[in-house]
Every structure is written in structure tokens, then in C-alpha cells.
Amino acid sequence: MTSDLSSKHCESCEGIGAALNSEQIKNLLPQLNTKWEVTEDNRIIKRAFSFKNFYETMAFVNAIAWIANIENHHPDLEVGYNYCHVHFMTHALNGLTHNDFICAAKIDKLLVD
């Protein structure tokens, strides 16, 4: 599940280099909650979260917004009454970077499964 990734901070996307390759992604994924998935094209990590009501959902979304602001790395969110789907990719590189895994690990720490 979560590892020391959650204690790291994101790098600026300017000059970050190349997107992670399949092997790097394969090594980082086990450091996240097992509910995170990688898309077949290795460009996105995603996870679905469920809640009891709209209030809990929005509290979670606001916590994600706070993390995203602090790290200056922002996910794509799909939000409904009792769910939030989180998708991370580094848009500047059209793929995954350590930043995506760092933010996912920080989100994992928000909830106890």
C-alpha cells in the first residue's frame, strides 16, 4: 500500500524529463493502495472512491484539492453524489511521472479502507 511516496513532494513539470516507462510504473504501483489501476496505454493511474453521502464526497474532494494545490499537481476528477473517480497523469508529458504516484500516495493516506 502506501509507502514513503506520501512523504515526498512533486517536482516542477518544467524540465521533468520523460514519462515513466512500463517497468518503472510496474515498480511504483505496488507502493499504492491495490485499488489504483493503470490504463492499458500506461498513461493514467486511476481509482474509484465511494462514500455514504454528498457531504463526505465533497469533503474528500476538498482534501484532494488541498493536496493538489500544495503539490502543484492536479488530477482529473469525476464527482457524483456518493463517488469520486480520480485520474492522474502528467499532462505536460502525456504520461505518468513520479508526481502522479506521489499524489496518489498522499490521497491514499486520507482514508482508511
UniProtKB/Swiss-Prot annotation:
Entry's Gene Ontology BP terms: tetrahydrobiopterin biosynthetic process
Keyword check for Oxidoreductase: no
Domain of life: Bacteria
EC number annotated for this UniProt entry: 4.2.1.96
First-tier enzyme category under EC: lyase
GO terms, molecular function: 4-alpha-hydroxytetrahydrobiopterin dehydratase activity
Keyword terms, alphabetized: Lyase
HAMAP family the UniProt entry points to: Pterin_4_alpha
Identification of the protein by name: Putative pterin-4-alpha-carbinolamine dehydratase
Species of origin: Legionella pneumophila (strain Lens)
